[in-house]
Structure formats: C-alpha cells, structure tokens
Amino acid sequence: MAARCTEAVLAALGVLSVCSASSSGSEASGEAEREEPWDGAVFRPPAALGAVGIARGPGSPPPGNREAVDLPVLLWWSPGLFPHFPGDSERIQCAHGACVASRDRRARADPRTRALLFYGTDFRAADAPLPRLAHQSWALLHEESPLNNFLLSHGPGIRLFNLTATFSRHSDYPLPLQWLPGAAYLRRPAPPPRERAEWRRRGYAPLLYLQSHCDVPSDRDRYVRELMRYIPVDSYGKCLQNREPPTVRLQDTATATTEDPELMAFLSRYKFHLALENAICNDYMTEKLWRPMHLGAVPVYRGSPSVRDWMPNNHSVILIDDFESPQKLAEFIDFLDKNDDEYMKYLAYKQPGGITNQFLLDNLEHREWGVNDPMLPNYLNGFECFVCDHELARLNAEKAHASSHGDIPVPEPRIAQSSHMNCPVPTPGFGKVEEIPENDSWKEMWLQDYWQGLYQGEALTAMIHNNETQQRKFWDYVHEIFMKRNKNL
C-alpha cells in the first residue's frame, strides 16, 4: 500500500512537524526509525530536555513558576509525530498543571518520564520499547483506519495501553467526529433538483463512486461491482474506473481526499454517493460519509455499524446493509432518483431545525478540540494535555499513598478496553467467505493480517510479563503462539 509520512496528519491539523523517510507498508505508514534511537544510555538532561519551549493546552491557566526540570515528561515515541516546532522538547501548560513534551528517546530512561505516546499507525509490536518500565503509562493515538494496524483491534493489543484517543466514543479521549467540522457543515444548501436533473440528461449516472485505494478489508469493490449490474454508476479513481474525470487536475488522486473547490463543484453534480469505508468498525466514519452530506447528496453507506447514532436525523443516509441484495438497493435508488419529493426527504436536515439528533449536537458542542478551527486546539495537542493531566493526577495519588503510611491505597492502573477499538474480522463485500477462492487477493491478505495482529498482541504481552529486554525475541514468541494455536485446532 502507498506509504505516506505522518506529516500529513499534522498538516491536516495545522501543526508543523519534521518527518523522516517512510518505510512501512501500511495505508498511512509510519516513518523509519530516527537516526538516533534510544540506546539504553544514561539519560542526559542537558541534551534531551535542555531547550524547552512553552505551549498552552485547552483550558490551561498561564504558565507558573515551576521549573521544567521538575515537571513530568511525556515522550512521543513515534518518529516524525511531535506536535510542536521547533526543537525536541516543549513545556506544555494544561488544565491541571504543566508537563514537558519531548521526542528525544534518551528521555525514556529518566524517572521523570511518566508516559510514552504512540501513534497507532506507526506502532509495531516488534519494535516496542522493552523492558516496559512500571512507572510509565502507554498512551495511544489512533484516529485512522483499523486496517493500518489490526493489532489494535484485538484485546491483547489494545490492553497494552493505559490511555487512548481513537475514533471510538468509548476511548478515553474520543475522536469519532474528527471529519465533521460542525453542524453548519451539514447545513450547506443543496443544489436545486433541476441542476442535477440537467446533469442526468447529459448522461451522468445517478450514483458516483470515487475510490483509488482498492483491495481493502471492507472489500467494497466486490459489492460495487455487483451493484453495477443493476444501476448505472460513474466510477472515477483507480478502482473499477469506467469514466475519466473532466479535467487533468481532478485526475490527481491526492485531490480526491480534499475539499478542493473544483472537486466539490464536480461532486455536487451527483444525487447519490457510494460511501463505503475501507474497514468496518463502530464509530469509524470519514469524509466519505460527511462530504456527500455537506454537498447535499445522499450517502449510500457501509462502514460504521453504529452510524445511525451520529446522523443529523433518522432519514439522512441509505444504509447498504438494510437491503437484502445489491439488486434491491439499486431498485430503491432508482425509485428515489425518479421521485424528487421522496429524495428531498433525505435532505430535510438542511432546513432550520432539521438536525434533530441531540446526541450529535451535544458531541459537537462539548468536544474541546476543533476541525480547522483556529479558536480551538487540534486533537493532537488536546490528547497530549489529557495525558499530562492524567499523569499529574497519578503523581499526586502516588504521593498521597506514600505519605499515608498505607491508609490510602496505591492508585490502580488504568487499562484500555476492547471497546476502545473493537473492530471485527473482515468479511467479504458481497457473498460468503467460503464462496471466495483461496487465492483471492482479499482473502490472502486481510484475513491473515487480521489474525496476525492477534498473535502479535499476545506475543508482546507475554514479553512484557516476562520482563524481556531483547526485542529480537519477538518473532520467536509469535511463532510459539502460532504453533500452540494450530496444535489445538
């Protein structure tokens, strides 16, 4: 799969970073190790944390007089992801106090380093820092697709972490609406029906499919291919392409993930957008869902099974899984295409008072981070402060225990739960898995990748419990787990 630098995440959030060359094979792959990885040497404060800038987090008071040398340290472990610029260390002022954020791996050995922050796409069990130090929390940021790291979709993998920020509403710092700027984004007026009727007369299909990332865990192309037998679909991009974009500029696949004005005007011609996520998981919703709604099109959606919880009202999206077959879905879309009054009911949320889902409105109103909002912090810095405040509270609890002569118990460690990701095994986009040939590329790739994630999570958990110090033993652990499982089959 195409590699990309974590810098794309920071750029989307308006945060600067320095990225190194990428060598991973995931969809949003991690960067290569920095040239000076932590080598177990004694921590040297002047080199690692000597030059500390100042940043303030959401709801934070002005900086106090506490010296940076006394503050707990948060270490960003993923190379290339550090939401501060320039330098390697930054004092951050958060709601309950201050911490030092750093990306210098030499800081790991220092007792002041209280948390390691990992970016899920970059996290590799084979390269996890060992031995795991008892006083350090592991914090996970993983807002991207489950396909980037299936280790995190299994209990043993997600429970490696103490704090999480994922697309799941159940995570400690939830990011399910990361692609939705606000309610106003949904209220943008739709094009008049007569405009789209004119495009239909010019030969445009009722349905748009725009994908260039093919062969994904959701197996969406298999479903769309079957749907095309029953209704016209204009397919752009590299997947099932049957029509060329009207301009050279729109042929650039990078443009397809943006809100480029020319692209948006082009997409607005279509009444229905096929919106199939690349992986299936509760609360995993991307621009594939929200952008059609912004443009006044009706999403024909497959992705998050919990998507109804987030819709502006109960009649704004067509769910593929509500139909017993692609043929039945095609018949329903054809009916709406020929009946403007019925079609417009799906756009009622754009009218004053049309957004009736209070759960959606409350989540948009009360989140402390924003999307392209200069008045709010981005979720990277927000999560960083969430971790800082947690570690400050944990330090205070440990001090209270120490001074109580045992009257106050030791604070219990916080452990992530399966619900913080909880992504199921991939299933075929159409048909049954036993009907698919064994040499099918989807079957060969994604089922194996999914279960390999389980073995890797179990292996790393065992290594931590055994206080292993040598990462090179990781694949021996994986092999042993694999052999035991196959022996019991």
UniProtKB/Swiss-Prot annotation:
Disulfide bonds: C385-C388
Subcellular location field: Endoplasmic reticulum membrane
Lumenal side: 25-489
Pathway(s) of this molecule: Protein modification; protein glycosylation
Membrane topology designation: Single-pass type II membrane protein
Catalytic activity: L-threonyl-[protein] + GDP-beta-L-fucose = 3-O-(alpha-L-fucosyl)-L-threonyl-[protein] + GDP + H(+); L-seryl-[protein] + GDP-beta-L-fucose = 3-O-(alpha-L-fucosyl)-L-seryl-[protein] + GDP + H(+)
A GO CC term attached to the entry: endoplasmic reticulum
Expression across tissues: Widely expressed. Expressed at slightly higher level in heart, kidney and lung.
MF term (GO), any: alpha-(1->3)-fucosyltransferase activity
GO annotation (BP), single: N-glycan fucosylation
Gene3D superfamilies registered for this protein in UniProt: Glycosyl transferase family 10, C-terminal domain
Glycosylation sites: N162
Keywords: Disulfide bond, Endoplasmic reticulum, Glycoprotein, Glycosyltransferase, Membrane, Signal-anchor, Transferase, Transmembrane, Transmembrane helix
Cytoplasmic side: 1-7
Claim: Transferase is one of the keywords in the record: yes
EC number in record: 2.4.1.221, 2.4.1.-
Protein family (similarity comment): Belongs to the glycosyltransferase 10 family.
Protein function: Protein O-fucosyltransferase that specifically catalyzes O-fucosylation of serine or threonine residues in EMI domains of target proteins, such as MMRN1, MMRN2 and EMID1. Attaches fucose through an O-glycosidic linkage. O-fucosylation of EMI domain-containing proteins may be required for facilitating protein folding and secretion. Also shows minor alpha-(1,3)-fucosyltransferase activity toward activity toward biantennary N-glycan acceptors. However, this was tested with a library of synthetic substrates and this activity is unsure in vivo.
Name of protein: GDP-fucose protein O-fucosyltransferase 4
Organism: Mus musculus (Mouse)
Gene that this polypeptide is encoded by: Fut11
